[in-house]
């Protein structure tokens, strides 16, 4: 494949992921096909976001690492010393992607390290490895372009996470602000009684203990359920099953108690 055809493969990957949930495994597969090497997309903390294998490496430690989707901390920390693309690293280097205990088997193994950057920060590392063939300038162009695309997608995913968290917080705050004083008091007692994200509640017992009417508890639960913060289901004489759907809800209740 010529450089243009290989570049188009990466462009297609970028167009596919636009506006969709990021699949780093598919991105790694595309880069493997374009560059012809093993590809590992590693986060700042060494989490293996995605990988694709061109040449199988028979080594138990490597297999375990891929299964656990986590690179060793010491190796990951070392990667951050590399600020620019470092190509064709041999197996004697501390940065080799081949198992050092099998240097004799993988003596012709070459590794290329490409920092993934975006938004003025280091987001992770793209690691390429293969046997017998060095990485050419064309390969490095594709690798750096691929790292840029991966960086854009990591930033996009982070933005989505931040937006989702902001939405969750806003929903919780709106739900709580819709409660009357007595309903809010009832809610605090309900989730003290629940002591977790889900469980059974007997409304009449709480009403008697706290000194509020059962209807206050029912109204409070109804408001929280209509806001999508909880789900509830009557189990007749056993009580009401309650499950928290929004992770921010219990945190907000705790914060209000502290205030």
Curated annotation (Swiss-Prot):
It comes from Shouchella clausii (strain KSM-K16) (Alkalihalobacillus clausii). Keywords: Cytoplasm, DNA-binding, Phosphoprotein, Repressor, Transcription, Transcription regulation. Residues 1-155 are annotated as: GAF domain. It holds the Pfam family HTH_CodY. Belongs to the CodY family. It is found in: Cytoplasm. Transmembrane segments: none annotated. HAMAP family: HTH_type_CodY (MF_00621). One of its GO terms (molecular function) is DNA binding. NCBIfam families: codY_Gpos (TIGR02787), PRK04158.1 (NF003170). The modification Phosphoserine is found at residue 215. This is Global transcriptional regulator CodY.
């Amino acid at each position: 494949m010529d450089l243009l055809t290989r570049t188009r493969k990466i462009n297609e990957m970028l167009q596919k992921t636009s506006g969709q949930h990021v699949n780093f495994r598919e991105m790694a597969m595309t880069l493997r096909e374009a560059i012809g090497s093993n590809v590992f997309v590693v986060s700042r903390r060494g989490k293996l976001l995605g990988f694709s294998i061109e040449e199988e490496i028979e080594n138990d430690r490597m297999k375990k690492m891929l299964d656990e989707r986590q690179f060793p901390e010491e190796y990951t920390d070392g990667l951050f010393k590399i600020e620019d693309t470092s190509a064709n690293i041999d197996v004697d280097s501390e940065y080799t992607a081949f198992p050092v205990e099998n240097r004799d088997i993988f003596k012709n193994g070459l590794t290329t390290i490409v920092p993934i950057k975006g938004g003025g920060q280091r987001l992770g590392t793209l690691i390429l490895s293969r046997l017998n063939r060095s990485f050419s300038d064309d390969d490095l162009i594709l690798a750096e372009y691929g790292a840029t695309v991966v960086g854009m997608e990591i930033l996009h995913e982070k933005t989505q996470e931040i937006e989702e968290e902001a939405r969750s917080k806003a929903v919780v705050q709106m739900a709580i602000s819709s409660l009357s004083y007595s309903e809010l008091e009832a809610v605090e007692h309900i989730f003290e009684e629940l002591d977790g994200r889900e469980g059974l509640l007997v409304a009449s017992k709480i009403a008697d203990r706290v000194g509020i009417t059962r209807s206050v508890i029912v109204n409070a639960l109804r408001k929280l359920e209509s806001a999508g913060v909880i789900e509830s289901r009557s189990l007749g004489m056993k009580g009401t099953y309650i499950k928290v759907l929004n992770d921010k809800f219990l945190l907000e209740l705790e914060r209000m108690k502290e205030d």
